[in-house]
């Protein structure tokens, strides 16, 4: 096994509570022991920890509603309690922890993304275990990542991680729902995430948590495209974290793509929300996917939404399937003026020469 790997471990609410409404501190100790064993082997460990709402509910010792405001209040109460528990448990092994609370806004902006990356790397360089959660107490719908599965994928990209372990209450990804079908079998390895797999994943979650298997599959797809191997496994399994680093691999393993993206394209994959969409024709799709070409106006059929030059947009086909993401060199109104036009016509159509490419190949990433 390669030493000095960066391992992101995502612990869902169901793992930390054991399916109850309280944190299972005995199991948390066991998870900490395994993380510290990885550190002894020379690896860096990052925890993406759910459980703030559950900790807040336990701390208040009274019933609370389940509205957004109630959950944000519980997160505000519970986040301090949660980090205190992690700090106490890691201290048993002489390991320091550091807290980072993130929102989508921290990765939308390139400068903030780089600052978050530098802070994360500094914690690892000082042999500190970062404990990361979304800033649920203040995050609004516009800046929320939405679930810690996708947050952990973004963290794995930030940290340039080798592995992402998504620990849950399920053994992994099955051929059908094992809770309703006794004949369901575990899928041991996945090399490509397609529509059939997405259907298998469904969309279940727990009352205390926000993530089901569908969000884990989405997170796995993001991370593997950035060159991160992903494993979905049952968090209650004996030595599950250590086994994920051995040949006794539990759960479902998602193979990383053979060519990890460079830093700028990782950011395009991980961070910003798309401001709009550009629809392209079959010829443009072929040029992007087989020739590594830039997107020219001639291959564009429509621009959807309102976006400005420099915004991140999604590139889709006529069936609304996602083809790529990238930084546009024209606004939505300009794209609709030049769509279908030859490059030499752009200056005349816009009264200025903005260049031939709607998206330059250096500013886009294929999906």
Swiss-Prot record:
Binding residues for substrate: 50, 136, 148
Classification via InterPro entries: AceGlu_kinase-like_sf, Asp/Glu/Uridylate_kinase, G5K_ProB, Glu/AcGlu_kinase, Glu_5kinase, Glu_5kinase/COase_Synthase, Glutamate_5-kinase_CS, PUA
Domain PUA residues, every copy: 275-353
Xref: SMART domains: PUA
Example of a GO cellular component annotation carried by this entry: cytosol
Binding residues annotated for ATP, in chain numbering: 10, 168-169, 210-216
Enzyme Commission number(s) of this protein: 2.7.2.11
This protein's UniProt keywords: Amino-acid biosynthesis, ATP-binding, Cytoplasm, Kinase, Nucleotide-binding, Proline biosynthesis, Transferase
Pathway: Amino-acid biosynthesis; L-proline biosynthesis; L-glutamate 5-semialdehyde from L-glutamate: step 1/2
Subcellular location field: Cytoplasm
Pfam (any one): PUA
Single GO MF annotation: ATP binding
One GO term of the biological process aspect: L-proline biosynthetic process
Keyword Oxidoreductase on entry: no
Keyword Kinase: yes
Family, similarity comment: Belongs to the glutamate 5-kinase family.
Function: Catalyzes the transfer of a phosphate group to glutamate to form L-glutamate 5-phosphate.
UniProt name for this protein: Glutamate 5-kinase 2
Organism encoding this protein: Pseudoalteromonas translucida (strain TAC 125)
Gene: proB2
């Amino acid at each position: 096994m390669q030493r000095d790997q960066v391992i992101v471990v995502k612990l869902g609410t169901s793992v930390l509570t054991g399916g109850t409404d309280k944190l299972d501190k005995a199991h948390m100790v066991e998870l900490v022991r395994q993380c510290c064993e990885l550190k002894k082997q020379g690896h860096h460990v990052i925890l993406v920890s759910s459980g703030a709402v559950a900790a807040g509910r336990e701390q208040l010792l009274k019933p609370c509603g389940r509205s957004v405001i109630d959950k944000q209040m519980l997160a505000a109460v519970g986040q301090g309690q949660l980090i205190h528990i992690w700090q106490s448990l890691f201290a048993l092994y002489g390991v320091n922890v550091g807290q980072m609370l993130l929102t989508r806004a921290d990765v939308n902006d390139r400068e903030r993304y780089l600052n978050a990356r530098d802070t994360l790397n500094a914690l690892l360089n000082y042999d500190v275990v970062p404990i990361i959660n979304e800033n649920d107490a203040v995050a609004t719908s516009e800046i929320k990542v939405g679930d810690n599965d996708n947050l952990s994928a973004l963290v794995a990209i930030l940290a340039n991680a080798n592995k992402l372990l998504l620990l849950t209450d399920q053994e992994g990804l099955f051929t059908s729902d094992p809770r309703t079908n006794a004949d369901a079998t575990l899928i041991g390895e996945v090399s490509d995430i397609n529509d059939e797999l997405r259907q298998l994943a469904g969309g279940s979650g727990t009352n205390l948590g926000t993530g089901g298997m569908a969000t884990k599959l989405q997170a796995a797809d993001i991370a593997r495209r950035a060159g991160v191997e992903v494993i979905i496994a049952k968090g209650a399994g004996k030595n599950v974290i250590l086994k994920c680093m051995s040949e006794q691999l539990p759960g479902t393993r998602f193979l990383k793509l053979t060519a990890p993206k460079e830093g700028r394209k990782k950011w395009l994959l991980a961070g910003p929300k798309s401001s709009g969409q550009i629809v392209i024709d079959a010829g443009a799709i072929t040029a992007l996917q087989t020739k590594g070409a830039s997107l020219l106006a001639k291959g564009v059929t429509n621009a959807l939404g309102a976006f400005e030059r420099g915004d991140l947009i999604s590139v889709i086909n006529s069936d609304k399937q996602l083809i790529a993401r990238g930084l546009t060199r024209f606004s939505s109104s300009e794209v609709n003026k030049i769509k279908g036009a030859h490059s030499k016509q752009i200056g005349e159509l816009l009264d200025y020469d903005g260049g031939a490419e709607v998206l330059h190949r250096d500013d886009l990433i294929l999906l």
